[in-house]
Amino acid sequence: MKHLVLASGNAGKLEELRAMLAGLPLRIVAQGELGVDDVPETGLTFVENALIKARHASAVTGLPALADDSGLIVDALDGAPGLYSARYAGSPTNALANNAKLLDAMRGVPAERRSARFYAVIVLLRHPEDPQPLIAEGSWEGTITTEPRGDGGFGYNPVFLDPVYGLTAAEMDSALKNRLSHRAVALATLQHKLHALSL
């Protein structure tokens, strides 16, 4: 079985990615298990940040690396929190504070203007200098609630409502969420390529 390092220190992302990749003939290893620290995300786009993370993890471990960079894009806030979703309310990352700041910023915004989407970019590098990284993107359309709902998931899940199911991401069971999410869409785009790679 081939090894693949997941370049993330976010426990919620790691759990989701591991579940989504479970059917592949790969041994998935979190970067923390290999002593790889998080690297500063200094890119100006989701793609740049994902490449930075994957390149760092691959360089330190010598293994192929998969990295995700994602965020919540809210139309009424001109795309915020966007690239800075994890640090929207400041550092260190605090999901409760981020959600509170978002709901405060959205106070008084009518229902028809509360559209948002989760967006993810997933990058696969076969080695640190890989000149042709595999890049896939995915999005999940929804709206922002007026108050948090649900106990599942992480991050902005309690305030992101899927209009088709009428549930927030935090109210969904993991099987449903892992089928609909922005990461699931991006991974589905990438998955068939993983089978053909010499990892």
Swiss-Prot record:
Q: What class of enzyme is it?
A: hydrolase
* Biological-process GO terms, alphabetical: nucleotide metabolic process; purine nucleoside triphosphate catabolic process
Cofactor binding note from Swiss-Prot or TrEMBL: Binds 1 Mg(2+) ion per subunit.
Q: Superkingdom of this entry's organism? A: Bacteria
**Keyword Metal-binding in record:** yes
For this UniProt record, the keywords arranged alphabetically read as follows:
Hydrolase, Magnesium, Metal-binding, Nucleotide metabolism, Nucleotide-binding
Binding-site list for substrate:
S8, G9, N10, A11, G12, K13, S70, F154, G155, Y156, N157, K177, H182, R183
Keyword Lipid biosynthesis on entry: no
UniProt feature coiled coil, ranges: none
Which Enzyme Commission numbers does its entry carry?
3.6.1.66
Annotated catalysed reactions: XTP + H2O = XMP + diphosphate + H(+); dITP + H2O = dIMP + diphosphate + H(+); ITP + H2O = IMP + diphosphate + H(+)
Q: Provide the residue positions that the database annotates as binding Mg(2+).
A: D69
Q: Tell me the active site.
A: D69 (proton acceptor)
- List, separated by semicolons, the cofactors it needs: Mg(2+)
* Family matches, as Gene3D superfamilies: 3.90.950.10
Q: Which GO terms describe its cellular component?
A: cytosol
Q: Which SUPFAM superfamilies match?
A: ITPase-like (SSF52972)
Named from the GO MF annotations, one term is:
metal ion binding
Q: What does this protein do?
A: Pyrophosphatase that catalyzes the hydrolysis of nucleoside triphosphates to their monophosphate derivatives, with a high preference for the non-canonical purine nucleotides XTP (xanthosine triphosphate), dITP (deoxyinosine triphosphate) and ITP. Seems to function as a house-cleaning enzyme that removes non-canonical purine nucleotides from the nucleotide pool, thus preventing their incorporation into DNA/RNA and avoiding chromosomal lesions.
Q: How does it assemble?
A: Homodimer.
NCBIfam families noted in UniProt:
RdgB/HAM1 family non-canonical purine NTP pyrophosphatase
Q: Which family does it belong to?
A: Belongs to the HAM1 NTPase family.
Output this protein's name: dITP/XTP pyrophosphatase
Upper lineage is: Bacteria, Pseudomonadati, Pseudomonadota, Gammaproteobacteria, Lysobacterales
